[in-house]
Each structure stands twice: as structure tokens, then as C-alpha cells.
Amino acid sequence: MIVEGKVLKFGDKIDTDIIIPARYLKYTDPQYLAQHAMEPLDPEFYKKASAGVILVAGKVFGMGSSREQAAIALKAAGVRAIIAESFARIFYRNAINNGLPAIVLPGVTQLINEGDYVKINVETGEIIVNNQKVYKGRGITGMPLKILESGGLLDYLKKVSVQNQGGN
């Protein structure tokens, strides 16, 4: 699975309250949530991300309260993948379950800059920056990769259910 795009870069400890503020949690429409993603840090984030971007972030991306809407909002805004030094565990699972690749690359904030163009092999963790530099992040394999390739957990379960019933 290959994912690519231009980089938007953020720092350490981006919590779920920053990713999608609590006042929007009563809404379920992914496109509405997307319009408010990262709003406290960058009110123009939705416009920047809509072309399809890769987020680069520091340590413990997605920390704080558990809210699935954080991953939903980012993906709906146009985020194709996130590369971070580390992720909060619950955010990491929510990202995978919603079809949003989350790649760990220690030191990434020193290696990749805002505006760089990156190409990620999700399975191997290979990250190519500006068609020149190559870095090795932690790839995603096994069941998490199958979930991502299906578009998320619900799509994966639908696919498996159809296969188990003798369909395509």
C-alpha cells in the first residue's frame, strides 16, 4: 500500500482536543468534522489538507481523551497518512480502524519539513522524501494492514462477511 502527498508539519503532544475540539463531538458528519480539524492550531487546515496531505508530527500524537472523531476528521479533511515520532495508543488504533495509516519514525520532525513531498510504503515503513532521501519507519503488517487496505475496520468486516457467505 503506497500513500503519498505534500507534508503539513506539527509539533509534539498534539492532543485530540486540538485535532477536533470537544464542541464538535455532537456531530457525526465526517465532512463537517473535517472543516474543524486542527482548528485551534490552524483555522485554514481544512483548506490546506483538502488536496491530500501527509501529516508529520512529534511525540505522542493523538494523546488525551479517546475520541474516534479525531481520526475521522483528519481523514475526511484529506489527510492520507500521519508520520509521527510516537502516537497515543488509542489514537493509533482509531486511525487504523478508520483507514488512516499511522507510521512511527523516531526523529521525523528533524528529517522531514513542511512542504516536502513524501511517498510511504505503509507495509515496509519506507518513506521517500522529495524523491531523494529514504527513511525507514515502522511498517504496518498483519491484520492492521488488512484493515487499512480495506478502507477501515467496518469495510474490512463487510468484506470478510461477504467472503464467508460465499460472495466475492
Swiss-Prot record:
Its EC number is 4.2.1.33. It comes from the Archaea. GO terms for biological process: L-leucine biosynthetic process. GO terms for molecular function: 3-isopropylmalate dehydratase activity. Transmembrane segments: none annotated. Pathway: Amino-acid biosynthesis; L-leucine biosynthesis; L-leucine from 3-methyl-2-oxobutanoate: step 2/4. Keywords: Amino-acid biosynthesis, Branched-chain amino acid biosynthesis, Leucine biosynthesis, Lyase. It catalyses: (2R,3S)-3-isopropylmalate = (2S)-2-isopropylmalate. Belongs to the LeuD family. LeuD type 2 subfamily. Heterodimer of LeuC and LeuD. Catalyzes the isomerization between 2-isopropylmalate and 3-isopropylmalate, via the formation of 2-isopropylmaleate. This is 3-isopropylmalate dehydratase small subunit. It comes from Sulfurisphaera tokodaii (strain DSM 16993 / JCM 10545 / NBRC 100140 / 7) (Sulfolobus tokodaii). The lineage of its organism: Archaea, Thermoproteota, Thermoprotei, Sulfolobales, Sulfolobaceae.
